[in-house]
Amino acid sequence: MVLPNFKENLEKYAKLLVANGINVQPGHTVALSIDVEQAELAHLLVKEAYALGAAEVIVQWSDDIINRERFLHADMDRIEEVPAYKKAEMEYLLAKKASRLGVRSSDPGALNGVAPERLSAHAKATGVAFKPMQVATQSNKVSWTVAAAAGKEWAKKVFPDASSDEEAVDLLWDQIFKTCRVYEEDPVRAWKEHADRLDAKARLLNEAQFSALHYQAPGTDLTLGLPKNHVWESAGAINAQGEGFLPNMATEEVFTAPDFRRADGYVSSTKPLSYNGNIIEGIKVTFKDGEIVDITADQGDEVMKNLVFNNNGARALGECALVPDPSPISQSGITFFNTLFDENASNHLAIGAAYATSVEGGADMTEEELKEAGLNRSDVHVDFMIGSNQMDIDGIRQDGNRVPIFRNGDWVI
């Protein structure tokens, strides 16, 4: 690497993810999912976790090339099946209340050209099989953090004009370190100050308890109802054991769940979405009485239709997140083709499941109680970006009065 002080900064990054991200405590079990290309970072993460007293660190390796070959050539019945040993591993991790650290670095187009029905069948099977883990994660029963590492093919997509593959990787690592505050003199303090700023916005919105939100922008005119006693959350979270953690590194969002029964109007995406190894652009969605009645995409249309119409609960929304256009990630002008970063450059919505913590007492509710409270239940959760510097958002009170929240893509509340 030619990036100055790369090894030193990679070590700082690993410490940040383990100590502040999933917040490893003595006796914790840690599940790390990471690509084989990122072995150097994986070694650092494992060492840091054990240094903080982890009882066990389980590494779940992935490989884009192997995954692609499997999707192209494996028998269809194997694509549609989740092996028993994978379910057993999930049950083991749940029993141990394992903290989950997912490091994303995949090529956004790794599965381009794979038949959409094969991808859809696999996504549906894994969604059903790993539902208990999804529920535990989305109700913060365990600590979980999603982070990123600079994969070569991903870096080439983000920086196509780089003079070499090595330069592209360096440029992407530089952006990851910047957005995760690794370059700060005291990254831990910098994260606390950032989280405090986001928490202040969440408190204002929680006090307001708006009945609905109204989004307006070119290609968008959408009204989303909000559940009674909804909760706006921001950077930090608390697991069922009372331990703090950071779900996303980086993050710029304040988010809650809409009432899945109350969505009317239409919305257009403003950034590409990388989903299931495909890049999807120009998404347009129409809602009536909470349900998606039409969805199209200029690129990846069949993939999106399969997502929405072939997965349980995917015809409704599970998240609405507010991100100011002047956020550092947005102002970088870079499209990352990675939801972790692109969602933190833009207001976004999520198709599918809501986080249980988006309503008061939700972490202790049954699936049926969550649904009665207005939180969508689904086997999927897929964010897509809708924000821009032309977006206005109003909060609508119970009496119909409106309060400006965003004007021209930025906070005014």
Regions from the PLM with identified roles:
Residues 15, 206-208, 276-279, 313, ...:
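Short solvent-exposed loop/turn micro-motifs enriched in small/polar/acidic residues
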Residues 294-363:
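Dual-mode signal for accessory low-complexity, basic/Gly-rich regions
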Residues 368-413:
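Extended hydrophobic packing segments that form well-structured cores
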Residues 225, 295-296, 406:
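Short linear motifs in exposed loops
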Residues 262-264, 280-282, 289-292, 315-319, ...:
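Active-site lining segments that contact anionic ligands and/or coordinate catalytic metals
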Residues 1-264, 395, 401-403, 411-413:
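Active-site bordering "gate/hinge" segments
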Residues 256-312:
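Long, well-ordered mid-to-C-terminal structural blocks that present hydrophobic/aromatic surfaces
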Residues 130-132, 200, 208-211, 251-254, ...:
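Glycine-rich, charged/polar anion/phosphate-binding loops
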